[in-house]
Amino acid sequence: MINQVYQLVAPRQFEVTYNNVDIYSDYVIVRPLYMSICAADQRYYTGSRDENVLSQKLPMSLIHEGVGEVVFDSKGVFNKGTKVVMVPNTPTEKDDVIAENYLKSSYFRSSGHDGFMQDFVLLNHDRAVPLPDDIDLSIISYTELVTVSLHAIRRFEKKSISNKNTFGIWGDGNLGYITAILLRKLYPESKIYVFGKTDYKLSHFSFVDDVFFINKIPEGLTFDHAFECVGGRGSQSAINQMIDYISPEGSIALLGVSEFPVEVNTRLVLEKGLTLIGSSRSGSKDFQDVVDLYIQYPDIVDKLALLKGQEFEIATINDLTEAFEADLSTSWGKTVLKWIM
């Protein structure tokens, strides 16, 4: 079977390429239905990654957030028509200590390997997680970002002290919003504070205990642990504010990605006995755990709906370009692609 793959060949330039797919291979064949654009995709699209990185990784199909429908499974594990969320991280070995998303041998779709912008995606069976029938697929398209947050929370739980009465979240964007949703469900008795700089973004966090502007933090405010969801150049000031306000022996979970090294007040980290926990991407278990949370707490999906921005029907390469360009001017939420190529 001929498969069409839509690749970024140069900044702002998509082209279609073709490969031959063996439908009787060991993979399950999934037709993408809805996808969502990530900031990492935009760094490739706009050419803002390092030139050496771009030359090594392009041409490449973008997008690592998406849901689809099983069209064929020669192994019979999935029924035709089963809706699944697609897992972008693909391990090539198993390690009893190191998680799959930290193994150097693992590869990640839309980061040196083709992403989900294809007519058909071939997945290992454990890279497809079944979804409930009655769920809104357009909202669930950005589940991968939810798994990144849950993975960070699970890592934090293993490495932090038992005091978990108060949490601070730095970042009023998509990742901060998702992290707040999950912490509210997982720690219903704890207080959650969100720190940001944009009023209309902070207004979405109606379910937390309080929100603060980063330049108007009350004197004497403190919390047990913190989650950094800022990234970019702003992560430096965010991390150092967390260090200033966090209680002794607290943990700071770092989720934001910065293209540049940041300076950290290590003197205060040592003085307070703080733990900094790095976290990146997620694995298939995180996806299954998130889907289980959707089923257990349907209101999580309702809250995630507030993140849905523009939805574009993608039938041509011009539609793709239009969607990526529009997403660049989106200050809140996720751009969704309805895949009808």
UniProtKB/Swiss-Prot annotation:
What SUPFAM superfamilies does the record point to?
GroES-like, NAD(P)-binding Rossmann-fold domains
Which domain of life does this protein belong to? Bacteria
Residues that hold Zn(2+) according to the record? 38, 64-65, 144
Q: Does the keyword NADP apply?
A: yes
Name one matching Pfam family.
ADH_N
Cofactors needed by this protein, per the record, are: Zn(2+)
Q: Pathway it belongs to?
A: Cell wall biogenesis; poly(ribitol phosphate) teichoic acid biosynthesis
Q: Which InterPro entries match?
A: ADH-like_C, ADH-like_N, GroES-like_sf, NAD(P)-bd_dom_sf, TarJ
Reactions listed under catalytic activity: D-ribitol 5-phosphate + NADP(+) = D-ribulose 5-phosphate + NADPH + H(+)
Question: What keywords sit in the KW lines?
Answer: Cell wall biogenesis/degradation, Metal-binding, NADP, Oxidoreductase, Teichoic acid biosynthesis, Zinc
Gene Ontology biological process terms in this record: cell wall organization; poly(ribitol phosphate) teichoic acid biosynthetic process
The protein's GO terms of the molecular function aspect are:
ribitol-5-phosphate 2-dehydrogenase [(NAD(P)+] activity; zinc ion binding
> According to the UniProt entry, what is the EC number of this protein?
1.1.1.405
| PANTHER family, sorted | D-GULOSIDE 3-DEHYDROGENASE, NAD-DEPENDENT ALCOHOL DEHYDROGENASE
Family in the record: Belongs to the zinc-containing alcohol dehydrogenase family.
Subunit structure as annotated in this protein's UniProt entry: Heterodimer together with TarI. Can also form a dimer of heterodimers.
Q: Enumerate the HAMAP family for this protein.
A: TarJ
What is this protein's function?
A: Catalyzes the NADPH dependent reduction of D-ribulose 5-phosphate to D-ribitol 5-phosphate.
Q: What is this protein called?
A: Ribulose-5-phosphate reductase 1
Record organism: Staphylococcus aureus (strain NCTC 8325 / PS 47)
Taxon lineage: Bacteria, Bacillati, Bacillota, Bacilli, Bacillales
